[in-house]
Amino acid sequence: MVKMNGKFMSNKKFEQLYMGLYVETKKLKPNKIVELGTGCGSCTVAMARTLQEIDNGGSIVTYEFERPTAGSGMGSDSNVSELYNRFTEIGLNEIVKLNVGDVFKTWVKNPTDFDLLYIDLDNTWDKVYDVIMGNEFITSKIKEGATVFIEGGHPSHPRMNQSTLNDFNNKKGKEIFTFECLHGDRISLSKLTIV
């Protein structure tokens, strides 16, 4: 179990995703992780804890939209300030660099080096395509061996499953991606491959 603020991240709905990221990151031992869609930060924490354990000097660059949080009153607090405080409180601020903004206008337009890319942007195949094929540097890094994980892939996922991928590939007129669902049920972790 991954610890956060002295408590376990125990939402059963997401547990397999967090643990899947932890296990897969530990197998890969990446140095440079890029995460698109920080959300509540739990996936970030799972990968960062792994980096701490393998102690290879690895880091995570994560991207998130800034939005007011519930009860913040006129936008005085945001999800980004909460994330920054959370990462600092649990000692991950040396490993995790939090960036704010639209990933397409920030990272896809001007990508940084990576050996693991994790995409969780309320995924659709079109969004994943726009990230991966949106910049030649990103595409070439993946073709050279960088790993891509996505949230989704289980048959019960509403937007990211084999049926929706078949529809997407048919719309493009050729097979673009394949994937292997590694962990989880509806909320799942899959490894993506460019064909």
Residue ranges and their predicted role:
Residues 1-28:
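Class I SAM-dependent methyltransferase Rossmann-like catalytic core
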Residues 22-195:
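S-adenosylmethionine/decaboxylated-SAM
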